[in-house]
Amino acid sequence: ITLFVFWEGTTIASVILIFAARTERAYRAGMRYLVIQIGSGLFLLAGAVIYYAETGSIAFGAFDPATIAGALILLAFGIKCAFPLLHNWLEDAYPEATVTGTVILSAFTTKLAVYALARGFAGTEFLVPIGATMTAFPIFFAVIENDLRRVLSYSLNNQLGFMVVGIGIGTELSLSGTAAHAFCHVIYKALLFMSMGAVLYRTGTIKASELGGLY
């Protein structure tokens, strides 16, 4: 229940950061983000209620994805972790937030889902092909994208895939590697988004086709 409360708390805080850009695109992206993430929270709450009805416990531990409760909770985590077919909110919302907001979003929102997956579904083998797919498909979108902050959003989705693979493997070494990767990713992706913010402030555009000679 505590996880659900703060899960929804991050949604509200994230939407505020997106709306802070005060553009029409940011408003539309923020509303899509809000609807999708509230849906994620409802799946989490439904799974928690069913889990309590079945076990009499609300302790956050390892869940069985073969049960209804486990499947609903996994779906909630998958939405926030941007699983394939559940990922569009990320590339829509992150580039439309303020520069500072994008840095904060990249550092904390998806990492909450990675942490939750590691706590609840470590060693769930079908996470390996899901994560492998996540490492591959964003690259094809990134290479044809003109908005550099969207490129970084696809790159973020790609890196989440490696973390999901590590969680799916579920060994002590793979989970330690996932934790280290997540920690490093918070730092270097934030720096990349800050550098794109500096380019935006300096040039007034973030379109790759309109930039050149940045030295």
For the regions a language model picked out, list residue spans one by one.
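Hydrophobic transmembrane alpha-helices and their helix-loop junctions in integral membrane proteins
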Residues: 1-2, 13-215
